[in-house]
């Protein structure tokens, strides 16, 4: 038993022990009293009590000890029975105990230094450290931000957190406004800035998903991501076709990964292979160029992963195989655009290095056209997997630089496979995901039954305002009810007039749905796990220490994308280089 438990137990039973010791003297007084009748004994005790208490120490006579034990145990039993049968009152909380949080409630969760926090509201922040002084105050850094159009999701929450500059950042940027306004802030704080632009490919760095394929497991992940985000709208048809496409794409990508030169491992080569896969319905023996490649592979590597997958695909008859090829071609149609082929020819984003040094990756997408948004989803899927693997394999489970994913317009980028599992596991690797939505129903529409799991792993949830009914209903229920006093009057007039007053207690929502719908534009509601909700002011961007470096403050600070992409790398005298002789490399 620990000292703390022993002290608590002693404090609980000390009064009964003291009573038992004192009453041993009463037992002695009773024993010394003369008389056979009860009345005589009691009268005689008037003289023996002073004698018994003349000695301050308790009596050790067996009968006296028995009296003490009975008195102490009797009092303990009486207290127990009274407590068991006592009425349970919660004065002032009869219909609910909901209330708004205070500065004292949030204080244990905030770091003393402003820059070491996530900005939640004007008055509430959350420390970046995963190991606070008191472990019970540890919270994950995942944040769910919900707010209707014009509620200030970007200005009042996303941009202030980006300006904190304490982590690496991956920012979903509709219309590229965040990059233009905050890009120079990142550069002046020593960040490497990387850009993937799906609106204007000419103002983008190159991104090649094949560059991050290092194993057969990675091949399956890439195929899953590609198919999940290029399946189009509406209900799916026969799953046979999707499974067949998966077989073919897996086989082709595996072949490129294991057999093709690095410069040919891209979507352009994948499309070229598909375009040469002619099928003759009336000639089952016909072999197209890709068939010949896999036939040669089977001779060289009989048990290759690519060969096994392709063999399964070839079980399809000619007409069926043709339909599979058409489906694959339609799925990869966006890559027929030359600009997109050029964009995915090689890789400059270096997604696996975001946890090594401070980096800001801006993923620019259109908020009106979702044609190329699947690329953004592919980036996030590969990013999470790469960083988790690197944290486990290289850094012992935790990245040296925290990586924050600020996913604005989360509903528009498509589905990130296994997001419900990722948000539950990335915390320990120093990765966090912040989802920004216009309504909770958007998450439900994309992730179905997994939406609740995703929300459940967001320790911080912020409502900036809106009128979507489901969001208002859920939020009102989560805020709970408070107990209020009701004052009623009655006034009866007539031949026998009367007047009366009455008081009663009622339960009332902390904020009802109609009150949430008309929430002040400068207010927001913060819910932090394990803490009372906060009704606070939104953070004022102009008060941030780095605000003067943004283009909001001075248009001269506008980030020039073209100038940045066309810059030449400067070689510093202290840079180290590794020289490799190509002729000395072993042949494939």
Language-model-derived ranges and their functions:
Residues 49-55, 63-118, 216-226, 272-276, ...:
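Short alpha-helical interface patches
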